[in-house]
Design a protein with these regions (language model features):
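Cytochrome P450 heme-binding "Cys pocket" and the immediately downstream C-terminal segment
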Residues: 316-318, 440, 444-481
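N-terminal membrane-proximal hinge/A-helix region immediately C-terminal to the signal-anchor transmembrane segment
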Residues: 2-116, 121-130, 145, 149-158, ...
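Conserved cytochrome P450 K-helix/beta-meander segment immediately N-terminal to the heme-binding cysteine loop
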Residues: 96-97, 387-421
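Cytochrome P450 heme-thiolate monooxygenase catalytic core
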Residues: 100-109, 143-305
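Cytochrome P450 I-helix active-site segment
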Residues: 34-36, 201-205, 259-267, 310-359, ...
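Cytochrome P450 heme-thiolate "Cys pocket" and heme-binding signature region
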Residues: 116-119, 291, 296, 336-340, ...
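C-terminal helix/juxtamembrane-tail motif
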Residues: 2-4, 480-494
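Short, small-residue alpha-helix embedded
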Residues: 300-313, 454
Length: 494
């Protein structure tokens, strides 16, 4: 009996030691000449309320900036996190070596994998080419901005009503409703009715599902999803209900808008449904790509608008100069061609994206074979590699000593100058808010349309400033943006 207990204790100690070694130290075959970020860095948001910019400054900024890459524990494994623009450019250029590898590969047993599956963002190889053939024409066509202008008018009305009722506006939930409306009505050819009701089903689902999907405990220790815990079973149930509701809502908006299989030159929703009806996509592929379109199609524009409003609220001089530029067009609803010609408007959007990229950190690439990053960092096959866009976009060597400051004029004063700098920064890996290479953001064109029209409407009809009672803090984890941003709006008449 005593011998059995001793054997059990020795085994328990051995297993515990092995787990701790695995968690606290990178694998022995990882590169030795780049810093290791303390294991607990990823866990700090679990134990106390943090501002993730403060955490970045304290733990990540110096080693990442000085070495260009670090070893980072995230998502239940050790990864290589890249920051140096030249390294970023190499990763983005060589997609066959640094292959996309999403949650369906990384944590196939996880709730998050059940939610997103394989999709246009996470797929690699032939499946990605298949999805891209459906998405690209649906996202990159010239959409009529009329619906966005109409929704922007509803947005201004909501801001007015909230300002009058509460004395300030928490803009984040309102902007979520707004970007969901644009996604559904413009890209998906349906309507989620999120601007008409704060309790619209898909908006309510999002409020329920986000805390379950992005629970930091399960994000950092995804092996726990192997356990059939009641809370995770409930999360899986909500995922299935949300997926069914999303597909049903989009399908209902297309009952008379297209003939079976006639998806060419149609909106994205029509193309996805037609691809499913003709057998190009399976039901699972339709569902996962619909989820991907839903998430990227509203969250990224929402985060861009939050950051732009935040920066313009802090810099009211730039806000006023932007108002002057827009007023020079002589109308409250300019043509989109005229909006595209405005240098300051474009520069404000790019500068907002530079300082606060909607996806501030992304680790979703996996090496297909051993590689020497930058000719000097050996990375084994099967290693997950990611990048920190928040850090890379503030690279002093490219952007200068004022890289931390909001300065739209750095982009140039003419559209030719701005476009040239945009192309150069992208090519050099110094501006990666839209990622880059073959896998650059397919929704960039629509995101710019939505941002231009929305900011034009808001700047021409309202002025805003930061609510003095708002505590200036960024989110503790996940997407990096102003937490619970509260602004005071004043309507401009005439």
């Amino acid at each position: 009996m005593l011998l059995t207990i001793c054997v059990f204790l020795v085994a328990l100690i051995g297993i515990t030691t092995a787990v701790l070694v695995y968690l606290f130290t990178p694998p022995s075959h990882f590169p030795k000449d780049i810093p290791t970020i303390p294991f607990y860095y990823a866990l700090l948001p679990l134990v106390r309320d943090n501002d993730q910019v403060d955490l970045y400054r304290k733990y990540l900024e110096r080693p990442l900036t000085e070495s260009g890459a670090v070893k980072l524990f995230f998502g239940g494994r050790w990864n290589i996190l890249v920051r140096k623009p030249a390294y970023i450019a190499e990763v983005l250029k060589n997609e066959d070596i640094y292959a996309k590898s999403g949650n369906q590969v990384k944590i196939p047993h996880g709730v998050l994998a059940e939610y997103t599956g394989e999709n246009i963002i996470s797929a690699h190889g032939e499946n990605w080419k298949l999805y891209a053939s459906i998405f690209k024409p649906g996202l990159q066509q010239d959409y009529d901005p009329a619906r966005v202008w109409s929704n922007a008018s509803l947005l201004v009305r909501l801001l007015d009503e909230t300002q009058a009722a509460e004395g300030a506006v928490n803009v984040n939930p309102i902007l979520q409703r707004y970007t969901l409306a644009n996604l559904s009505e413009v890209l998906l050819g349906s309507t989620f009715e999120t601007l008409q009701s704060p309790n619209a089903p898909l908006h309510a689902f999002q409020l329920r599902i986000k805390p379950k999907i992005f629970d930091p405990v399960f994000l950092n220790f995804p092996f726990l999803d192997h356990l059939k815990l009641p809370t995770r079973q409930e999360a899986r149930k909500v995922v299935r209900e949300f997926t069914d509701e999303l597909c049903r809502t989009v399908q209902s908006g297309h009952s008379t808008c297209h003939e079976k299989g006639q998806h060419k030159h149609k909106n994205l929703g029509c193309r996805l449904l037609s691809a499913f009806e003709t057998g190009i996509l399976t039901e699972k592929q339709l569902q996962h790509n619909m989820i991907s379109a839903f998430l990227a199609g509203h969250e990224n524009p929402q985060l861009l608008l939050i950051s732009a409003l935040f920066l313009l609220a802090e810099d009211t001089d730039t806000q006023e100069r932007l108002r002057t530029e827009l007023s020079s067009l002589g109308t409250r609803e300019p043509s989109y061609a005229d909006l595209q010609s405005l240098p300051l408007l474009t520069a404000v959007i790019y500068e907002s994206l530079r300082l606060y990229p909607p996806i501030s950190q992304l680790i979703n690439r996996r090496t297909t074979h051993p590689v020497l990053l930058g000719g000097k960092i050996p990375i084994p096959a099967g290693t997950y590699v990611g990048y920190n866009a928040y850090s890379t976009n503030r690279d002093v060597e490219f952007w200068g000593e004022t890289a931390e400051e909001f300065n739209p004029e750095r982009w140039g004063t003419t559209m030719d100058e701005i476009n040239a700098l945009f192309r150069r920064a992208n090519a050099r890996g110094s501006f990666i808010s839209f990622h880059g290479g073959r896998r650059a953001c397919l929704g960039q064109k629509f995101a710019m349309l939505e941002a231009r029209v929305t900011l034009a409407k808001l700047v021409l009809e309202t002025a805003w400033e930061v609510d003095p009672l708002w505590v200036r803090r960024m989110t503790p984890a996940g997407p990096l943006y102003a937490r619970n941003l509260r602004l005071r709006f004043c309507r401009i008449r005439g």
